[in-house]
Amino acid sequence: MKALLDLFKQVQQNEQFDAIKIGLASPEKIRSWSYGEVKKPETINYRTFKPERDGLFCAKIFGPIKDYECLCGKYKRLKHRGVICEKCGVEVTLAKVRRERMGHIELASPTAHIWFLKSLPSRLGMVLDMTLRDIERVLYFEAYVVTDPGMTPLKRCQIMSEDDYAAKYEEFGDDFTAFMGAEGIRELLRAIDIDRDAEMLRQELKDSKSEAKIKKYAKRLKVLEAFQRSGIKPDWMIMEVLPVLPPELRPLVPLDGGRFATSDLNDLYRRVINRNNRLKRLMELRAPEIITRNEKRMLQEAVDSLLDNGRRGKAMTGANKRPLKSLAEMIKGKGGRFRQNLLGKRVDYSGRSVIVVGPQLKLHQCGLPKLMALELFKPFIFNKLELMGLATTIKAAKKLVEIQEPVVWDILEDVIREHPVMLNRAPTLHRLGIQAFEPVLIEGKAIQLHPLVCAAFNADFDGDQMAVHVPLSIEAQMEARTLMLASNNILFPSNGEPSIVPSQDIVLGLYYATREAINAKGEGMMFPDVSEVIRAYDNKEVELATRITVRITEYPKNVETGEFEKTVTRYETTVGRAILSEILPKGLPFSVLNRALKKKEISRLINLSFRKCGLRATVVFADQLLQSGFRLATRAGISICVDDMLVPSQKVDIIATAEGEVKQIEQQYSSGLVTAGERYNKVVDIWGKAGDDVGKAMMDQLKVEDVTKRDGTKTTQESFNAIYMMADSGARGSAAQIRQLAGMRGLMAKPDGSIIETPITANFREGLNVLQYFISTHGARKGLADTALKTANSGYLTRRLVDVTQDLVVIEDDCGTSNGASMKALVEGGEVIEALRDRILGRVAANDIVNPETQATLYAAGTLLDEDMVEEIERLGIDEVKVRTPLTCDTRFGLCALCYGRDLGRGSMVNAGEAVGVIAAQSIGEPGTQLTMRTFHIGGAASRAAVASSVEAKSNGTVRFTATMRYVTNGKGGQIVISRSGEVLITDDLGRERERHKVPYGATLIVKDGLVIKAGTALATWDPLTRPIITEYTGTVKFENVEEGSTVARQIDEVTGLSTLVVIDAKRRGSVTKTVRPQVKLLNEQGEEVKIAGTEHAVTIGFQVGALITVKDGQQVTVGEVLARIPTESQKTRDITGGLPRVAELFEARSPKDAGMLAEVTGTVAFGKETKGKQRLEITDMDGNKHEFLITKDKQVLVHDGQVVNKGEMIVDGPADPQDILRLLGIEALARYIVDEVQDVYRLQGVKINDKHIEVIVRQMLRRVQVVDAGDANYIVGEQVERSELLDENDRVIAQGKIPATYENVLLGITKASLSTDSFISAASFQETTRVLTEAAIMGKRDGLRGLKENVIVGRLIPAGTGLAFHRARKEKESWEAEERTALLQSEKAARAAEAEAQFADISSTPDSDTDAS
């Protein structure tokens, strides 16, 4: 019976576990795993193909080759199970034990494990406090190390060369011991007293003052503490026994022709065994030291290359000079165990085929080829055949299916009914890349896909392939149906917009049907209802675009009862719109259709339908829109011809004018009036404008056509030109493309992104000549190369994002925090870029939202704001709302639903178990391929748009200046701005900010603070081409270091003959004058230097490189006068990183080069004494303490003497460093910075992503904290730990009434954050596998399997979605069972105790009668 049970035991699933621990194995442990020692390097006998005894494939050690059969064939079959054959020594059991039984090799000399030696920082070095170089010299037999100095003056761990050793040996004899090789290191490791060393280090840390020492000690202490905690002995890093991998995991397979294919590991093991055996022999023979030493070194190298080939020295190579693949390479990298086999597996019950369009399908269906379905659903068909008694065995059923018996098809229909399949299109960039559909059997071999889901899959029908997967279990089918069915996923999870938006011909059909034409056939007819309209249309009495009047039935929703009430209304509309009104879902008014439907409108329509009528109605509506769109597009019969491309008549004149202007510029250039750079910029500008003008003229001509009204008068209407309609509706093409067809192609770019100044004046209709064609191919190639690189880069960004966020899951409903972020509308340059409603939609209010007019609470805190609510908030003019955000969520090891808000892909509150981290990563990564790769050169053509020279108000209101705005009034009474960050605000009657405008330094203000103005009033003007340097004081100019030929050069204007001084670049000047900087001081009437008000510092105004000095030495100047101008052209064109690299830079939290400087404290600014190349800036804080900053002189300082700055304000111009923002302004400001910057990049490409996704990533970048003061908690100062863990530890400490640890936030880039997670499995599968595993093993780390990745790797259900509930139930059950067990044990204990008590009582109470009787 027991044997029978044993048989079943092997099938049963292993026990549940909650964590995985990694550590170092002791030699005893390795021997206990082993089933015997491998003594010979032989593998198998090449004649008999049987494994050699004691060899690498030995059956005695590793188990039999055939199931239940020993090697010599004495015992066969099940009845001998467990017998060990006395002839060949093989146990009779299953052959698959060869996958799990390990062997071992007893090493003749101890060997260091290369990971702990060479993986930086070297763990051996840290424990022994020796340098890696020294340890290596000892291990590879180049030097001796003293292990026991005895009574001699030598030190432990002292290194000496052979000659030194010989000399010392002569001197001291046997009083000291020194070793070479791993033995020496092992002795040193054994001698370490970890507890004592750790204590000493703690003391040193307290006493030490030097930063470097503290850092060093802390590192070593961390390693020692890890050993203390994990109970791992340091000398286990030196191996005495080498484990041997089970043979099936390093197979040897015979190929035809008598050759063998083998795993590289066998070669590596063979070398180790050979060298080991040779060393044993040499030691038995008592060979000379030098020979055994060499053999030991070779053994060490053999073991090294088995563990990690190529880590040290040259890699061992096989017969074909290819480096052998070691154990380390098996697990790391894309082809390693983690990423190849554990995170991504190949799946059974799957197939792939080309996709074709299936317009007749419903949204939740897909067409599955019969043959594919037959193969995929085989097991289900076999089952059915057996149940129906058509086949007795699986074999018979298989036969029936293979000959495709007619009954099989009926059964297939039956099996497929209501059994969803999953379709996937690679690359799967977001969760909509896999969706479930109900299969419909079709003839042919291609999968049919519903046209509306193409947008989500990013699929088209030019030969794309898709994979089909079959969910097998009932649970899997249920999840596929409820969560993944295409009709349940009609919104994009990235922004909450519909993903099933019609495109191309559907849009064209709907657009054509809803356009109106003047004086079309049957105009002005009246119809009682839509059916009559359809009759008239079918009888060709009216056209689609005819304007008619008709009674239309609508079903508005009654607010009180929630019922749909039938109403009939007369509408003036067109035939097409009336016909479309038939498919409008109940609850939507006809007015939404009563307009020309462009793509954006249709998207809005579907969104509206989803919000008002629910999911089911919307899906039906979308399907009907699709049908109508296709049908109407076919009826319309729109086609394009060459004559549709109307070339504007003005084109010739525009080009001629431009050519004239270019000639003029060329002449000015040849006569030296303009520089080469200016000429190029101006030419490019002229042609750019010419191209735009031609395009505009062409569009104006295309847009309208002449028609005759019914009364005979002439008028114009929107054109029915086919090309124009396609572009206008959003079906295909854009204005820019039409411009190339019928306008002019315009300027082309070179591969380096610079613009070729010769434009292509022709368009495609006229045709290009050879030169023009060549120019246009020149830049096109760059585009193709970019696209290929972009895809890889974008994929890598997505991978890093997923890795950093994969363990973030919604695990509770409410964390109870009242924190949040204040949201305002995003305004830039007076334009609202993102309205408040869009920013707070789908978020939860953190505070009560109050009606500003009545002060009544409008929405209580904790309300999820939906469309109607945000509209109400906007209507009331509330301009700031505090909402909950993932950043301030207090949930540990996860997020709460209220801080996250609406699940955008479902349109309702997020559910517990939703993997919001992965969704955020996908939402940001998925559009990555649409972003550009190039870094823009600002300057020249790209900056054309930026040349604004004034700013005007867009709305009526009151002018207000921000606190940072400063200006002086010059002699002419003009107000000149002298602050670098001043802004003008316009507020309405209630004092709410309506718009804000930045005003540059040197601008002239036209309005005053508090002025009431009308829209369109100019607020300020400035010269767009130069940047002035302005004086704020009156006095006489005194030049310093302004010397012609050394710091400045004189430029003479050839036309006017006037000369100006230009400051030259220090790099171009001689070495003597490099550090001198031309500047101006001002003198007063008495000839003394003018001082800065309230200080002793003289006013010094420095000139930057390229500045044109406009004043003369000794000239009298007044406040606000211009001393010099810097032409903006000569401002060095700085590269602005855009696109994908910018997003990656932000998420990696890289500090930009030449970063701007932020004020460390709030206080008053003063300039201190200047040093050679730097200027000194002092900020005196409120308590009177001074803080000094040294700033290189070429930087632009944004503050001036006496200005009060706030902590975190920019004081030196340059890009902000996210680390500074976090340190000085806190988490919310940092998040706002990263969110805004990332959104800028995506917005430029027209991609919408919800802010909360970026916030989720920022939360993960901030999940580590640095311990500032450990208090009584179990941490070292300066250690980085997981925030949640530290808070848990603090709770524990506080509960005991002790002092908790204090910490500061740390911002890590996404790669760094992924690698520093608490889960070593997740980190190892991401990057730097060796380093992660080495560190984890020494620390004896425990992986609690919290994240998704770890669970996928160990093959469990992930703790997200339905898996979260499963794991929770399991844990509850376990704790409940444990309680029950303890209760049971206690009751048994009590019973036993009672029993013993009773026995004891019996014994004591019986009188000694029996003794008497004896």
Swiss-Prot record:
GO molecular function: DNA binding; DNA-directed RNA polymerase activity; magnesium ion binding; zinc ion binding
Disulphide bond pairs: none
Subunit structure: The RNAP catalytic core consists of 2 alpha, 1 beta, 1 beta' and 1 omega subunit. When a sigma factor is associated with the core the holoenzyme is formed, which can initiate transcription.
Catalytic activity field: RNA(n) + a ribonucleoside 5'-triphosphate = RNA(n+1) + diphosphate
Name of the protein this chain belongs to: DNA-directed RNA polymerase subunit beta'
Protein's organism: Herminiimonas arsenicoxydans
Annotated function: DNA-dependent RNA polymerase catalyzes the transcription of DNA into RNA using the four ribonucleoside triphosphates as substrates.
Family recorded in the similarity comment: Belongs to the RNA polymerase beta' chain family.
Alphabetical list of NCBIfam families matching this protein: rpoC_TIGR (TIGR02386)
Cofactor remark from the record: Binds 1 Mg(2+) ion per subunit. Binds 2 Zn(2+) ions per subunit.
Biological classification of the source: Bacteria, Pseudomonadati, Pseudomonadota, Betaproteobacteria, Burkholderiales
Source taxon at top rank: Bacteria
